[in-house]
From Swiss-Prot:
Protein name as annotated: Coiled-coil domain-containing protein 40
Cellular-component GO terms for this entry: cilium; cytoplasm; extracellular region
One of the GO biological process terms: embryonic heart tube morphogenesis
Coiled-coil intervals, chain numbering: 130-154, 210-430, 548-572, 609-765, 814-856, 895-915
Organism in which the protein naturally occurs: Danio rerio (Zebrafish)
Pfam families, A to Z: BRE1
Subcellular location field: Cytoplasm; Cell projection, Cilium
Amino acid sequence: MEGRQEDQMNRQEEVEQSNNYDRSVDHARTGRSSWIDNSEINSKWIPQHSLQLEMNNIEGEGSVRENDEEEEEIVVLDPEHPLMKRFQTALKNNFTNQLERLNLDLCEKVVVEKAEAQRRHDLAEEVYMVQEMLARLQASLEVCQETNSEAAAQHRQAEDHLYVVKNQYQDTASQTNVQRLQVLELQSKVDNLALKLLYMQEAKSDLCSDIKAIINASNKAQKERTQTEEQKHQQDIYVERLTNRVEKLLEQISLYDLQLISQTEQTRAAKDSLSEAQLELDSVIVEHRQLLQQWKSSLLMMKRRDEAYTAMQEELRQANDQMLSLDTEIESYKKSITQEEEQNECLTLRLNRGQTDCTTSRKLITHSQNLQEVLQAQLSTYTRILQETENTLSTLHGNLEMHQSALKALRKQMEKVSAVRLDLESQIMNKLQEQLTHNNAAKYSRRMNDKTAVYRREKEAQLIKFENDFNTVTLEGQELATHLDSLLAFQAELEQKSTQRHLLLSSREEEIVKQITDIERKQATISIYNKKIKDIVSSTGHEDLGPLEIHAATLSKELEEVGAKIKECQQLWLWQQGELVRFTQEKQAHSSSVQILQTQLTILQQGKIRRESEMEQDQSELADLDKQIKVLMADMVKLNSLLNKNSDLNHALQQSSNLMETEFRQRLKEAEKDSAETQLKLERLNEEKERLINSLVEAERQVMLWGKRTQLMQETCSAIDSDIGQGDIRTMRAEIHRMEVRYAQLMKQQERLLRDMESVVAKSKTIAVWSEAQARTQAHKQPTHNDYHNTIQSLRRKILQTKKQTEECDGVIAQLEERLGSMTSRLQDKQMHLNNIQNTEAFLSQDLRRLQEIKERNLYRLPVLQTRAKHLHAVKEGRYTPMATGVTALELGTHKQEERLKMVSLTLQRLAQEYPQHHSTLHRMNSILAEHLHGECPNSQ
């Protein structure tokens, strides 16, 4: 029974102890939530016990209060306690081993730091050299920028000077055009006056020749008056025949007068010749009156009329020839128009080809622009990546600031590396800014090159236009020269013919003079013989025909025959004189045309000289522009080389910075891993240490509690009588026995806890050794100086490979640039060809417009001429009634009409200025009115 009771009591105590243990565990969980995981892990090795005893309910409230006070007390063992010596010796050995290991690690780290400091010094020297090179490049770039700015200023000055020269050229061109128009007007006036003067001189010469002929005829008539009286009977019949012939000639003259009037109304030259013919007809009428008195003079005048008639027929023939030549010219114009249309079709085909080439070039340009956009997108992605890297670097800076307390040495190194990185970033930013400035300068130079190319194309187009004008002028000059040669040949032929005619006339005149002298001599002999006959007749009183009389009769007959021959020769001489006059007139006309052509040729030669001077000026300007372009191209080549060098340096710096960043990041990650592992190990060791100390303190407290309780029990036993409370004594003995058993258990537990503490120290030592071994393995894995050297060698190999790749890329870029240059040259050639085609098209369109204007002008003049012909026909038939009678009324009417036409032309000019969209039609109408005004002015005169 007692054994069962003791067992039940032991069970109750164990249950209470387990409940108290659970309460202490809950209190530890609520108090130290951060050590839960480590306590759960370390609970496998370190068992935690908390002993707490309670007195029986029999003992009273005082013993319960004492037990509560004992439970609330926390006993802490002194370090010099004999129980702590074993633990302290183990900890001391552990700490000494750790100190030795840390000293060894510190020596190794000092050596590594020295090597790192040497490497940093070398890297700082390299960075200093790179900075010096960058400064030199910056200075050269500033010099290039200054040269570019100077070149741009010179280019602007050249453009301003060119603009001023263009304005001056336009002003001078407008002035020259106005002066040319004035010269042409004055030349036309001078030509008209010269023609009038020639006509007047010809009329004067004709009148002088007529007067001389009349004087000679009157003298001859006075000499032959005596002879005519004797031969009056024979010539009355001849006079009647002549009167009939004169009447016929008068009828013919009236017909010729009508024809002459119609011809004079058709052309201005015909009008002048008609006025002369009318004057000659008046003189013919006067001479006809004289012919009624003097038949010989009338005969001569009729011969002259015949000559005038032949001259008019010749002029009519010439007019017909001119009409035929105009028809041939019209046909040639039609053929040329068809040829121009074919040429225009060919040009349109070429233009379409050029447009297709332009479309292909535009497609290529769009493709290059797309490539540029893709490259810009890549650049934006690279910038975004750089920003992300900067963000990551900022985050790393934050992490580094968080771990500054634990990693001071790494923090210093990191600060140095970050300073280097900041310097590199500033250098990279400076390089990027320099690259942007280079790009802007390159864009500006490209823009200036494009402007110069456009200006050069314009100048080339102007030069081609000048060459075309020069070629046209040379062709016109050659045509004029050929025409002049033909005219000179024709003039030489005419001169030869005139000389032949003059020789014939001189020979005939000599023969006539000889015959006249013979006739006069014979007449003198006849008169002598007649006197002798008269003397004989007067002496004898009758006529006797002797041989001499018969011979005289025969001689008189011969004289009559000779007189008839003389008359025929005189008629032939007169006809030859008319031919000579006609030839002289043709010669004068040819000489006037030759003079006009010579003046035109001189004008064209002056224009040629002026255009050659302009072309030389343009060529000199083009040479200057070529020189400037070459200088700019050399500057561009230098800038491109500098840009390539800067890009290579930037690329190398970026690669080195990227490599340093990657290495630094790897080292940071490894250091962070090491620091995290060491922190975890330290936290675990601290937790284990605290738990062990707590368990030791609690065990010591339990031992002290049990000592106090045993002392109390002994005192109670001594105080209690032997007689009183034997049952209680038994229970107390049982309790004491239980306490002794419990004490033995606690001593065992204390021994076990001490062993656990020693094992914890040993385990911490093994953990430290294991962590050191792992750190050493990781340290072995980390790169040494040889590894760095190997990595540098591999990086150098990679750099060489990248340099080779960049050289290959440069070669490809050079090939592409050559292809681009060839494409640009081809585009420029095609552009020049297209400009030539456009210039020829514009020139042909101007010619076509001019021909259309001439056609419209002719179509406008045709009904006017038709109405004029109708009016002339009405005048011929006598049905025309004039609007104004008298010179003053006619002048007033013409003046009014001219004023009306001037008002209409002014209104048309104003409308053309107000409505430029209808400028062509209004200008055409205005030109027709101007021609009408210019045509009416000489007619009115």
